[in-house]
């Protein structure tokens, strides 16, 4: 008997297989690109979604469901999120005999019993699959599952050690060995989260540490350790731990001075004061094809696009140019934070910044994540329901703060970045 298969059915099967293949990992790096299992080049255009605050649950769920937050991100063309966490989340799991904290405890400890109870009820109303006994990592898992459904990549970012707003030179989280930045706990936390997130198909990268910076109130630590040699030493420790737990993860390495430059890591210069040079062989088994660099830029009051381009290039994007004679090691480089106020005088001051980035990032095909998706936080800097003037979303997360910015600058920036 001869089986007849209609052309329409055959086409639908092909489309179904193509969709099912997303994200088509494992991923690796080839020169300046991240590529999937087919060798297709992957670019990321996304937003930061913080989860490193005192509650240690990703923000905004008192206003929207996980599905709606990600649908809004997807609606303007974005294909990625930078999902942040605090090392303290893992510290608490170890202190609790390996058991994660439930949402009831997380919100009450983060916001106080009265307000925590009120906010939790709003979260549960918007996300009815959760209960008060749902754990924090189960929320992260739900975000990862929805990212898979909506084809949104995840960069999992260790943002801070002590769960709170970041960053400053006196916050105790500046540098390895600072008062709240225990090195062993950091290595353990990165490894734990790598093992946990290994099951997330949408995870494409894992960032080792957000914004290493000078400990301005800790002179002894600054004088002893705030240098490129120690950054390189600690990044190798963290990368080894993440790779051991999740060999498929692409690992993101940051630089000094709030991660505003990574030049010594790709230029071949000696890392001071030790004199060693970045060597992929130091990252045994993965240094050739699992490393990415990241930088941040907040020069949003500048009036010269050429100056901004120059700084972005010479502080990081240069590493993507294999023809540049000053580049010893070629890497993909991601701009994992940039941003500005969304309204008022501060937004107007940033006109050169937003227009320049909207043109330049697609031009260099750099992956990027804007800071930040948030409207109101659960709490920030001691203020509950803090409304972030830099946030893309309105205070109640119901829409965009600045539709003109989205339409005129951000959407073209997204489309240009992701254009094949």
Predicted regions and their residues:
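Short, solvent-exposed turn/loop segments enriched in Gly/Ser/Thr/Pro and often Arg
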Residues: 84-89, 159-165, 209, 257, ...
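Extracellular glycoside hydrolase catalytic/binding regions
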Residues: 177-178, 184-205, 209-367, 375, ...
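Chitinase-like catalytic core of GlcNAc-active glycosidases
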Residues: 89, 109-110, 114, 132-150, ...
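Aromatic- and acidic-residue-enriched carbohydrate-binding clefts of CAZyme catalytic domains
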Residues: 95-136, 167-180
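Residue-level detector of anion-binding/catalytic polar loops
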Residues: 79, 151-153, 332, 367
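Fungal secretory targeting signals
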Residues: 1-20
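Aromatic-lined carbohydrate-binding surfaces of glycoside hydrolases
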Residues: 85-92, 144, 149, 153-173
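N-terminal carbohydrate-binding accessory modules
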Residues: 16-82, 93-115
């Amino acid at each position: 008997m001869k089986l007849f298969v209609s052309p329409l059915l055959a086409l639908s099967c092909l489309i179904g297989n193509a969709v099912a293949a997303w994200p088509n990992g494992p991923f690796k790096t080839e020169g300046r690109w991240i590529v999937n299992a087919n060798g297709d080049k992957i670019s990321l255009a996304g937003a930061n979604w913080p989860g490193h605050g005192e509650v240690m649950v990703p923000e905004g769920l008192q206003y929207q469901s996980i599905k709606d937050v990600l649908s809004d991100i997807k609606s303007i063309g974005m294909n990625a999120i930078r999902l942040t966490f605090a090392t303290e989340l893992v510290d608490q799991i170890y202190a609790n005999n390996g058991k994660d904290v439930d949402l009831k405890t997380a919100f009450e400890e983060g916001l106080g019993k009265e307000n925590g109870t009120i906010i939790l009820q709003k979260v549960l109303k918007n996300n009815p699959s959760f209960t008060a006994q749902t754990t924090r990592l189960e929320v992260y898992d739900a975000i990862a599952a929805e990212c898979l459904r909506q084809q949104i990549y995840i960069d999992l970012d260790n943002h801070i050690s002590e769960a709170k707003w970041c960053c400053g030179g006196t916050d105790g989280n500046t540098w390895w060995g600072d008062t709240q930045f225990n090195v062993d706990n950091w290595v353990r936390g990165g490894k734990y989260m790598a093992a946990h997130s290994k099951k997330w198909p949408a995870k494409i990268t894992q960032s080792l540490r957000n914004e290493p910076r000078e400990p301005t109130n800790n002179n002894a630590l600054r004088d002893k350790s705030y240098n490129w040699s120690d950054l390189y030493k600690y990044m190798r420790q963290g990368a080894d731990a993440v790779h051991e737990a999740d060999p498929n993860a692409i690992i993101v390495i940051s630089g000094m001075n709030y991660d505003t430059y990574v030049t010594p890591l790709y230029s071949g210069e000696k890392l001071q004061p030790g004199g060693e040079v970045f060597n992929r062989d130091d990252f045994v088994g993965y240094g050739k094809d699992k490393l990415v660099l990241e930088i941040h830029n907040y020069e949003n009051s500048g009036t010269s696009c050429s100056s901004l381009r120059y700084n972005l290039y010479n502080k990081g994007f240069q590493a993507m140019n294999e023809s540049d004679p000053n580049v010893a090691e070629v890497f993909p480089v991601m701009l994992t934070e940039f941003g500005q106020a969304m309204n008022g005088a501060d937004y107007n001051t940033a006109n050169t910044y937003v227009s320049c980035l909207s043109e330049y990032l697609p031009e260099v095909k750099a992956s990027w994540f804007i800071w930040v998706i948030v409207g109101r936080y659960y709490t920030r800097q001691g203020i509950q329901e803090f409304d972030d003037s830099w946030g893309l979303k309105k205070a109640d997360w119901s829409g965009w703060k600045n539709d003109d910015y989205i339409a005129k600058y951000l959407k073209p920036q997204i489309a240009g970045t992701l254009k094949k």
